Amino acid sequence: MEVRGFTYGYMAKRGAYQSEAGKKSQEAMFDIGINWMCLAFPLYQDTYQSTKIRFDYRYDITEKDILTAIKRAKDRNIKVCLKPMVNCKDHIWRAYIDFPEEDFLGEDTYWKQWFESYTAFLLHYAEIAQDTGCEMFCIGCEMLGTERKEEYWREVIKRVREVYKGPITYNTNHGKEDKVTWFDALDYIGTSAYYPVARAGGATKDSMVKEWIKIRDDLKVLSEKLNKKILFMEIGCRSAKGCASMPWDFMHKELEREEEEQAAFYESCLEVFFEEPWFQGIFWWDWSTVIYDTEEEAKNDVGFNIHRKKAETVIKKWYQKGKESEETNR
């Protein structure tokens, strides 16, 4: 598995990457043995029906923040995937960004306006990715309502490739991988692999493995069809009971804390996919910009963080295995 990664920095505010806490957290993430970092950060449009993406100089992550986080990774010989994202200020999931197909005059007015703004947004960060030597660029995340607009997306890809010369991917949602008709124009098939591999809390690693095998077999068919490797741009689950049945969940704070189920989710996935030649790798979701320090503090956390939890031991083991395999095959 080439990409043994983690996502860092999502939802951080201006200055967070440059802060001492941000540095400390990023270094702790490096220490688990990753060889790739996905640097994910959002800009915003006002509502899910807005056509303009805006930069807020009060809050949004700055170029200096991005350059700082990339440099730290490069100093540790860790490769970087830059992943600019768009969120909606009205708290609607970006998957619902959508517009009418045409107006009374037969014009695609809203889509043209939105893709014009989105392309300009992407090209700015594609230039940063190129100038800083980022090894991958992600052009979008879980934008299901836009994915049918194939002509527009192919133009986005063309424009990005004029600026950024490395491999690019797009991050669709789990179960939608075969619906993206323009994946052939990209280098990897990216997905948020929040597949439910349990029906309730208390599922074992072995039962999860059986579910992952079914998912693996389906993804292998798609990989072979498009002759593209599969990349889990996002995947993970919280340290909460029942998390493997709804890995995407971040809302149910009342759930009982459960490290074992989280660890089993990570272990089962790696066991099934790690050696597959058509599988490019994983960016686990996600590593907070400000992280706790001790196991005692970890016991109060029921989020996606794995720091000082059993899942962290799982990741270290498998990522070390990958490193040793690479060194042996050199």
Predicted regions and their residues:
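Substrate-binding cleft and catalytic face of glycoside hydrolase catalytic domains
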Residues: 35-51, 65-146, 287-290
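Glycoside hydrolase catalytic-domain groove-lining segments
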Residues: 62-63, 68, 76, 83, ...
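The substrate-binding groove and active-site-proximal loops of carbohydrate-active enzymes
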Residues: 9-16, 50-63, 104-117, 140-147, ...
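Aromatic- and glycine-enriched glycan-recognition loops and surfaces
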Residues: 14-31, 54-75, 120
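Aromatic-rich peripheral "rim/lid" segments of glycoside hydrolase catalytic domains that contact
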Residues: 16-17, 247, 263-268, 272, ...
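Aromatic- and acidic-residue-enriched segments that line the glycan-binding/catalytic groove
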Residues: 57-58, 89-112, 186, 250-251, ...
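Short, acidic/polar
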Residues: 15-30, 115-128, 173-182, 263-272
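Active-site neighborhood of glycoside hydrolase catalytic domains
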Residues: 121, 136, 146-170
